[in-house]
Every structure is written in C-alpha cells, then in structure tokens.
Amino acid sequence: MTSFSHLSRLRMSAFLPHVCLQCRLKTVSSLPAQSSASSLLQAVRHASSARPRRRTPSRMTLSPNVAQSTVKYGEKRKSVRHQNGPFGGMNQRRANLRDRQRPRSQAELKRTSFKKDKDGSEKKQPELFKALKMQTALSSVSYGRRTSIKSKISNITSFDQFDLLPSVRQSVYDSALPGLEYVTPTPIQRLAIPAILRQGSATPKPEEGQEDMPRFDQYLLAAETGSGKTLAYLLPVVDAIKRTEAKDKEEEERMAKEELEKEQEQAKEKNQNLFELESPGEEEEPINAPKSVVKPKAIILVPTSELVEQIGRIVKQLAHTVKYRSALLASNYTPRKIRKTLFNPNGLDILVTTPYLVASIAEANPYIFSRVTHLVVDEADSLFDKSFSPKTNTIIDRTAPTLKQLILCSATIPRSLDNRLRERFPQIRRLVTPNLHAIPRRVQLGVVDIDKEPYRGRRHLACADAIWSIGRSGNPYDADVGYQVTGQKEPKSIIVFVNERETAAEVAEFLVTKGINAVSLTRDTSEKRQAQILAEFTTEKNPPQPEDYKMLKGNRSDDDSVPFVNVRPGNERSNRLSNTKVLVVTDLGSRGIDTVAVKTVILYDVPHSTIDFIHRLGRLGRMGRRGRGIVLVGKKDRKDVVREVREAMYRGQALI
C-alpha cells in the first residue's frame, strides 16, 4: 500500500509539468495515502487554482504618511494629469509625483545611455568629442571654475572702476579705443588689470628651504584670441612706470634739497676756514667717453617682427596721452636704426622686441637688463617651445635681480607649457577667462567636401570657387550703412591658410589665373613686402559717409533723376574680382596678428591640431565682430575632427 501511494505521488508530479514547484508540492502533499484515479485527475484539474493569499486592498489599509505634506502651506496642489483610457490611473502601485524627480541609480543611467539599432540590438552611443580627445594637446579648465570666473567679473563694467592713474585711464578712450561710444573692458581685462595692479600680492613669502625661489610676482594671462590681452597687461605696466617715475621725481627733489643745504653748510665752513686747502672733487666724465646703452624699465617679448610692429603701434598710441618713451627692435631694422635706438641719450621706458635680438644685444651690452622691473612674454606657448625657450629663460634669469613682475600671455595653453610652468613657476597666478580654448560663437564654420561634384578632388578649384562666391555675394543689409547709402561695393578681405610654405605660392598663382587678387606671405617674403601686405589686412578702412552720397548726387547731370541704390550692372560679366583681396599664408599670419579687416577665413588644408584651429579661426570675430570660416576636406583629411570642432563651436565649448 505504501509503494502504491509513493507511485501515485510520482505520477502526480509528472502530470504537473507547467505548475510551479510550490503549488505542485502543496497538491501532492494534500493527497490521501490511498487515492483512486478519479481523485487524482480531480486534483490535477484544481491544481492551478492554488495561489498565495492576495494582499489587502489599499482602501482597507491606513496610511502611515498622513502628516507628511507634499504641498507647502499657501500653495495650491497641482492638478493630477489623468492617463488616457477609461480606467487610466487605477490600481497603481507607485505614486506618480511629477513635482519631484525620482533618483536614478547608476545602473539605470548606464542602461538609458544605450540605444537600440535597427535590428533590435543595443548600440552604444558614441563618446562626445572622441576624436578631439584622442589628439588633445591643450590643458583643460573645469567648467565649474569657468562659471565662478563669470560671476566674479560680472560686476566690472567700466575702466573707471580700475585703480589706474587718471592719465592712463583717459588714454584708453582717447588713444587705444578712439571713436567708440561705449567702451567696456573685456573679460581678460576685468581679471588681469586689478590683479596686476596689486603688486606684491601674487607671490607669498618664501618658506624655509625655498630661499632660491623667485621673489617677483608671476602672472599667466590665458584668454581667447582677439579678447584684448595687449591692453590687459600694457595698462598696468604703464601705470606702474608712471607711479615709479613720480616717486623717483620726489626722491630727486628731496636729494636736491639736501644737496643744496649741504652746499650752504660747506660755504659757511669755507668762509670760516679761509686758509685750508680744497679737497679734490669727483672727476668729470670726458667729452669723448663712449655712450652707455639704454636701460628700459619694461621689456615686451614677442616671437615675430610682425607682432613687434603691431604691439609697438599700440604702445606708441598710448604714449600720446601718457607721456613715456618707447622703442621697437626687430630683425628687419637696419643696423643704424638699431644703434640709434640702443644709445638714445633720452633713455627708454618700454622696449618691444624679440628674444633672439635682445639676447644678442645683451651679450655685448649686459647693462641693458639692469633696470628692468616688468617683463612680458607675449605668445608664451611659442616663446617657451624648443626653439625659443633657451633664449627666453636666459632673459628671465638675467632680469630676475631687479624684476618685480613677470607676465606670461597666451591664447592657448598646451599641456607641455602647463607642465613647464608648474615646474619653473609653481607660485604663478593663473588668470583664465571662461571662454579659453573656445572659438567665439559669432564665428560660423562651413565645410566643403572637395571629393563631390563639381570639384572631384581638385582643392585649388574648390578654393577659387568659394572665393568667387564670397566676393560676388553680399546682402546690402549686412554691409555698413555708408555702403548701403552710396551703393558702392564693400571691400572684402579673405585669408587662406595652408600647412606648407611651398603650397602658399602655388595657391596664390592659381588664384591669380582665376581673376582673383591674391598674394602669398611666407618666410621667403622680404620684410618690406610683408609690412606692405599685412597693412592691407590689419587696418580697416572707414566706410563712406553720407556726405559722399550728397557729393555723388550733386554731380549728376539730371537733377530730377532718382538715385538707385545698389543698381545691378548689365549682363556684362567681368573676369576679375575687383572688390576682394586674398592673402595666402602659413601659420606665420595666425599668431597674434590683429586682422580686424578680415571677415572670412578659408582653411585650404585641415589644421594638424586644435591649437592651429584656434589660432587660424581666431583671425575672425575679433573685438565682437562676426566672421565666417570655411574648411576644405578631402579623402585623406580627418573629417571626424572637423565635425567635432564644428559641433564644439556651435555649443560654445572649448576645443579640448
């Protein structure tokens, strides 16, 4: 009998393959020891009805959160958003509180970052700026720090808020930025000018074992291109020179007064002792003695002679209002002009030059660094690379005994420069703007695929077609008011950047054959020719005034005729682009040149790094102006890098 019951239990478990294990065990254990076949079948029929006990409905359970209010006192409760359907919102197990967001776990966030492909498989979303991160060369700045800097400088809206001398402050309006109705400092000027004016606050006192550390203040000015970095360091330097000059003048007056009193006392003693011999006085300097070299108080170092001319122009402009002596030294100057500058009997306050030239002068005249109190290293990323760093470091070491402030300035901070500054100047104060390593959003970037029709890989033809399209196009509403009134064509200046020096001459020659006024600028170009070419792209011509329109109207033969504005010419089509000038250049023209007259830049070759992207496109959007960039891409170019640069520009993010 026992064996029969055991056998029946085994058969019963075989009949329940689709019933859960718990129900199966309950059914089998509830069977009697002696069972017939009919009772077994009846048990199988009702086995699926065996379920665990249902939980108590919510309407029969007291809420433990009665005292917990989800609405503040005095506020109205938000209306509940009903679900679609006749029974929507019924029997919900979770409260749908839309006023607060449910915290999500890391696993859930990771799952939501995946998206499904067409075949239903999960596909990982590509990492943002992956191509730029793979070839990153710039030192990043956290966005939290960028936000804090924005809030810090938001209260400064005028140059009058800076503790500058009245003459220095007035020179901004009269000399540096004349003719502007509203003059406000840029972000780097709001950061740098107050910091540099507080002398002695940037370098703490050396601790034990750090007596060999530099005693002068150290600053790093890092800001985007075209943001006014030159005025940011030049105004505090000029202010310090004028304050020191005033103190020296007071000291000279005091010394002269003491000397006069001393002479009067000696005269009284001489009258009392008439028979004593006079002591030999100091020997006078012979007339034919060699002249001493000038001893500037501030030196501004730049990498190229073009930058010497540009920054020297600003230094000379400020000197019209603030009286000081300045000079420029570059390799394209004649030996006679250099000698005249070095041995000027009137002295010198500010010297703008290149590291190699001033270092070679110091070998023969070491006293040129004896009075330097301010040293500015502009374009620091270039002056601290392998080619310039030995001379730059030598100049810093030789000026260190009398130096008060060292100012480094750059638009890009590579990781190599960042590491070198942390080793050499660990106490340097970093003044970084929120938009560092970012191209302004007012600059638009277009991409031309040269592999498509009608170019078929001919990069020269794509460049010429883009220039012709820009030269012939133009909305009169985008032009200056003077050109709208007189109907004249607005002159256009375009810069074409190439990677190789040989390519520049080839591209310029091809563009000339297509009726485009194009010239090339490389190291092979003579210094005089370089100055003439850059003058056309760095100086902006004033637009025609309404008086010119009146003069044109008065010269008409028919006084009753109606003047038409921007009348299109006939069907005659010229083979030359008369109102457009093109400059084909290498990276020689991408560093610091203030190309205010340029509104379009064409990247003939894709730049090698994001640093070149920033400097080349940085020729646009200067001082709040708009600009347009065009990059030509082919089969062998990194299209993913160009795409991410364009996306970063649209987002206003830094090119990491």
Curated annotation (Swiss-Prot):
Residues 1-46 form a transit peptide. A motif (Q motif) lies at residues 157-190. ATP binds at A223, E224, T225, G226, S227, G228, K229, T230. It is found in: Mitochondrion. Residues 210-431 form the Helicase ATP-binding domain. Its EC number is 3.6.4.13. One of its GO terms (molecular function) is ATP hydrolysis activity. Residues 60-71 have a biased composition (Polar residues). The lineage of its organism: Eukaryota, Fungi, Dikarya, Ascomycota, Pezizomycotina. It comes from the Eukaryota. Keywords: ATP-binding, Helicase, Hydrolase, Mitochondrion, Nucleotide-binding, RNA-binding, Transit peptide. The Q motif is unique to and characteristic of the DEAD box family of RNA helicases and controls ATP binding and hydrolysis. Residues 480-656 form the Helicase C-terminal domain. InterPro entries: DEAD/DEAH_box_helicase_dom, Helicase_ATP-bd, Helicase_C-like, P-loop_NTPase, RNA_helicase_DEAD_Q_motif. The keyword Transcription regulation does not apply. ATP-binding RNA helicase involved in mitochondrial RNA metabolism. Required for maintenance of mitochondrial DNA. The keyword Magnesium does not apply. Belongs to the DEAD box helicase family. MRH4 subfamily. It catalyses: ATP + H2O = ADP + phosphate + H(+). This is ATP-dependent RNA helicase MRH4, mitochondrial. Residues 96-125 have a biased composition (Basic and acidic residues). A motif (DEAD box) lies at residues 378-381. Residues 42-125, 246-270 are annotated as: Disordered. GO terms for cellular component: mitochondrion.
